[in-house]
């Protein structure tokens, strides 16, 4: 009876060590499975990745300099570089931005013309969800229209704020909020 127990102990030890070293187990990193983030059914999936842990910053300049017609009075922004693709040399580094900004009536009226079919809110960095009240009603705006309306002359953007293209945008008239994602290359 002692022999089966002696054989079982080493097998259990191997099983425990193997499970601890499983490379397919999600880790708490920015590139891990999206289940690590808060969930909110109002938003599209957050698809951007970074080698760094994204940080939410309060920066109106990041919005108002790149998109001068936004005229944001408050902005919660995440800007990060996408993971580098080592096999593609001489590629300009890609970076992404997700934001929630407070905007005036003037900006809302400017964007109203670009109303598109309503869909989910843009897939912003999930730690920005807290800045989007549940009671806000949103209208989806065509990204190309929004880009041209908010930044009519991208050549005038200072070089230390690389221009970006809006990927998805929604505006709330009742809450004076702009929720959007953008991509750029530096």
Outline where the language-model segments fall.
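Bacterial N-terminal signal peptides that target proteins for export
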Residues: 1-9
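C-terminal motif of bacterial Sec signal peptides marking the signal peptidase cleavage site
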Residues: 17-20
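Secreted/processed peptides and extracellular or luminal domains of membrane proteins
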Residues: 27-28, 142
């Amino acid at each position: 009876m002692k022999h089966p127990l002696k054989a079982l102990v080493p097998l259990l030890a191997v099983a425990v060590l193997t499970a601890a070293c499983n490379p397919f187990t999600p880790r708490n990193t920015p590139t891990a499975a999206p289940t690590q983030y808060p969930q909110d059914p109002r938003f599209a999936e957050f698809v951007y990745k970074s080698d760094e842990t994204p940080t939410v910053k309060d920066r109106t300049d990041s919005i108002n300099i790149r998109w001068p017609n936004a005229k944001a009075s408050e902005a919660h922004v995440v800007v990060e570089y996408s993971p580098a693709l080592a096999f593609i040399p001489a590629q300009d580094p890609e970076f992404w931005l997700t934001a929630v900004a407070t905007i005036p009536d003037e900006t809302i009226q400017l964007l109203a013309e670009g109303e598109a079919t309503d869909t989910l809110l843009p897939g912003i960095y999930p730690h920005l969800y807290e800045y989007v009240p549940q009671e806000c009603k949103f209208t989806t705006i065509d990204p190309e229209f929004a880009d041209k309306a908010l930044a009519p002359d991208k050549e005038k953007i200072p070089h230390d704020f690389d221009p970006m293209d809006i990927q998805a945008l929604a505006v709330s008239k009742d809450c004076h909020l702009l929720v959007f994602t953008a991509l750029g290359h530096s």
